[in-house]
Amino acid sequence: MGKYTKADILRMVKEDDVEFIRLQFTDIFGDLKNVAITSSQIEKALDNKIMFDGSSIEGFADYDTYETFPWRPQQGKVARLICDVYKPDGTPFEGDPRYVLKKALKEAADMGYMMNVGPECEFFLFQTDENGLPTTNTYERASYFDLGPLDFGENARRDMVLTLEQMGFEIEASHHEVAPAQHEIDFKYGEALKTADSIETFKLVVKTIAKKHGLCATFMPKPKYGVCGSGMHMNMSLSKDGKNIFADDNDKLGLSQEAYYFIAGIMEHMREMTAITNPLVNSYKRLVPGYEAPIYIAWSAKNRSPLVRIPSARGAGTRVELRCPDPTANPYLAMAVCLKAGLDGIKRQLPLVPSVDSNIFELTREEKKARHIESLPANLREAVLCMRDSDFMKEALGEHIFTRYTSAKLDEWNEYTRQVTDWEISNYLYKV
């Protein structure tokens, strides 16, 4: 049973003095969209009678996602409801990423599982120019865990945390990250659909509050050369009857057989999934040696160089950390394909290769080959081609999203390859 009923929403809209409601949904690339209505139309929206484009698709509001925006005026407030998208015949729209995740979660539920996810979202705070336009300038030299006055973004980050808490987030920690102007705010893990919704809200809050401080927040994976990029590590676990099924006290690593199968499924399908977890041309500028980002498809409970890490917490906190995703990934699609891969590992009881407890970046090519360690795709084109050839990904995403996503991403790559970059001008113009 949901948290709110229709009567609850109508009452809260009145009590909160809400004048505008944003009916939010997400496109296949993870970009947040909305249709705004006045409070006079809220009952119509709650009865699923709002058309998003005037004819072809309808928004079905998820009552439990009702929140007011704390940064808006407190008289005549603005609230939001996240919507599922349906066709006029009452069937789910195949292009709705939320529907894709719901399908994967239903498959897990049919096996008795519930998925929990805890993301670690990193971002940069840059200066804006005299016209308020974003730059990549920062005048700070702060690094990991530094604080003010070195951390120029401390005040903005604090206001982000307070705003997120007002919107129901349980913030566990916030701190400066490794690169100058880079930050991380961690919120408590939760059920996968709620967490995916929260990631979209998180990004909206971070960008909005940064702008109020005269800054530009960006989730671009690698906005500057020579520094660490921004990731979105995904900590995942499955529970059954309220118990974390990844934990097993009798195992030497404290992991259950289901956990090993789940990891094997992730590793089996990782190259096919990378175009979803790392969706931009720029994503692959982060996935290079020397900047704390994974490149090789391996796992470990002891070091951070592999793709999959098992954090030290055990018991209820036992989880699998996937370290390649970045914050530009569509969270609904990323969680859906990770869950489907893990479930495939469990269903097929895939054997897991031995862990790699040494630094993979120090292994020779021959040593990696002997251990059957593959690399992630080196660029977006390679990732999309891996995805395009995958029956697993077509089934996981559905024909509608699969076809449109791969086509759009190849177009993005082709557009990129036609650009003449500053690096080319600097290295070739005066030499040839």
Where in the sequence are the language-model features?
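ATP/Mg2+-dependent ligation/transfer catalytic cores
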Residues: 1-173, 195, 215, 370-432
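A generic structural motif
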Residues: 27-29, 86-92, 149, 189-195, ...
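Short glycine/proline-enriched loop/turn "hinge" motifs that connect secondary-structure elements
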Residues: 70-77, 115-116, 174-179, 227, ...
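Short, hydrophobic beta-strand segments
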Residues: 81-87, 183-189, 236
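Core alpha/beta catalytic barrel or barrel-like domain that forms the active/cofactor pocket
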Residues: 116-127, 136, 167-187, 217-235, ...
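Active-site-proximal beta-alpha loop/turn segments in soluble metabolic enzymes
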Residues: 137-147, 180-195, 224-229, 241-246
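Short, contiguous, pocket-lining structural segments
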Residues: 148-156, 173-179, 191-202, 206, ...
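Catalytic-core signal marking the mid-to-C-terminal active-site face
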Residues: 201, 208-211, 215-216, 239-432
